[in-house]
Regions:
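Non-heme di-metal
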Residues: 1-105
């Protein structure tokens, strides 16, 4: 993988995480009655989505419908069968109950 490809992958991950974080912040602001602030966070999240989609397209991560469905099935299957069971096991071993609940939900 070239440096640029690594940078694109890192940028995609960062923009994607920022999107989800800003949406979580917006939800919190709504709960606190701060609708204007929530709107700002949603706008920032939307901008991050545009950036993430651009990086994903350049990386060749958006294909035809059949391929997109297969990538989704494979990814969700991995999470369900391998990733989360291991995460749950490790969190249980560390006695981190909130993490166990988060990984199960």
């Amino acid at each position: 993988m070239s440096k640029t490809e690594k940078n694109l992958a890192e940028a995609f991950a960062g923009e994607s995480q920022a999107n989800r974080k800003y949406l979580a912040f917006a939800k919190k602001e709504d709960e606190e009655g701060l609708a204007q602030v929530a709107r700002l966070f949603r706008a920032a999240a939307a901008a991050e989505t545009v950036h993430a989609h651009a990086h994903l397209r350049v990386m060749g991560g958006v294909k035809d419908t059949k391929q997109n469905l297969q990538v989704t099935i494979d990814g969700e299957g991995h999470e369900f069968k391998e990733m989360y069971p291991q995460f749950i096991k490790e969190a249980e071993a560390e006695g981190n109950k909130p993490a166990v609940i988060s990984f199960r939900n």
